[in-house]
Amino acid sequence: MIIYLHGFDSTSPGNHEKVLQLQFIDDDVRFINYSTLHPKHDMQHLLKEVSKVIDQSDDPNPLICGVGLGGYWSERIGFLCGIKQVMFNPNLHPENTMAGRIDRPEEYEDIATKCVDQFRAKNQGRCLVILSKEDEIHDNTKTASELEKHYDIIWDESQSHKFKKISQHLQAMKEFKNT
């Protein structure tokens, strides 16, 4: 089973396209929607929904993945639920990048203070990061320097921030999921 979390643009047709692409490596792909506007509520909602679909599945190696803000949540929710994660162009600091887009971006700071200390060290090897050199939203060299000591990073040469086409990374995801 693969759980897919959308980014800030929850209505993008690219979300459906990514779900279809993910079905090439696992026919059980679950799309979990969340508001993107209320971080504390989103965290509770995602924990509940992801736990529920994990319990419903008999897959011994479920995987959670997301793009942008969905990558942020995939890492945290996947860690808390004990499943592997794949992040595409993750938004690592939504407390900064979401300012002006949502009412209370400071809720992300509060979430960070409640997270397990050094959770990335404890999550070592459980997350695969795919970063685009053409991300027009984030400087992925900074993202890489923050994550490379904990996770393997794959660089993509052509995709934009929303990562419309993930098919070239499906084999790496499948191998990561099943190891």
From Swiss-Prot:
Pfam families on file: UPF0227
Source taxon at top rank: Bacteria
HAMAP family: UPF0227
Family, per entry: Belongs to the UPF0227 family.
Designated name of the protein: UPF0227 protein VP0969
Species of provenance: Vibrio parahaemolyticus serotype O3:K6 (strain RIMD 2210633)
Taxonomic classification: Bacteria, Pseudomonadati, Pseudomonadota, Gammaproteobacteria, Vibrionales
